[in-house]
């Protein structure tokens, strides 16, 4: 349960971070 939760949180964080990088890149950073 803990490992599954940790894995889900890490995947969600990586997904949101990648989106933020794309948005900032389009805005010219």
Swiss-Prot record:
Main localization, broad class: membrane
One example GO MF annotation: electron transporter, transferring electrons within cytochrome b6/f complex of photosystem II activity
GO cellular component: cytochrome b6f complex; plasma membrane-derived thylakoid membrane
One of the GO BP terms on file: photosynthesis
Matching InterPro entries: Cytochr_b6-f_cplx_su8_sf, Cytochrome_b6-f_cplx_su8
Annotated compartments: Cellular thylakoid membrane
Superkingdom field: Bacteria
Pfam families: PetN
Keywords: Electron transport, Membrane, Photosynthesis, Thylakoid, Transmembrane, Transmembrane helix, Transport
Coiled coil: none
Chain segments annotated as transmembrane: 3-23
Membrane topology term: Single-pass membrane protein
Assembly mode: The 4 large subunits of the cytochrome b6-f complex are cytochrome b6, subunit IV (17 kDa polypeptide, PetD), cytochrome f and the Rieske protein, while the 4 small subunits are PetG, PetL, PetM and PetN. The complex functions as a dimer.
Function: Component of the cytochrome b6-f complex, which mediates electron transfer between photosystem II (PSII) and photosystem I (PSI), cyclic electron flow around PSI, and state transitions.
HAMAP family: Cytb6_f_PetN
Homology family: Belongs to the PetN family.
Name of this protein: Cytochrome b6-f complex subunit 8
Organism: Crocosphaera subtropica (strain ATCC 51142 / BH68)
């Amino acid at each position: 349960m803990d490992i599954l939760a940790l894995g889900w949180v890490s995947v969600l964080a990586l997904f949101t971070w990648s989106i933020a990088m794309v948005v900032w890149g389009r805005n010219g950073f």
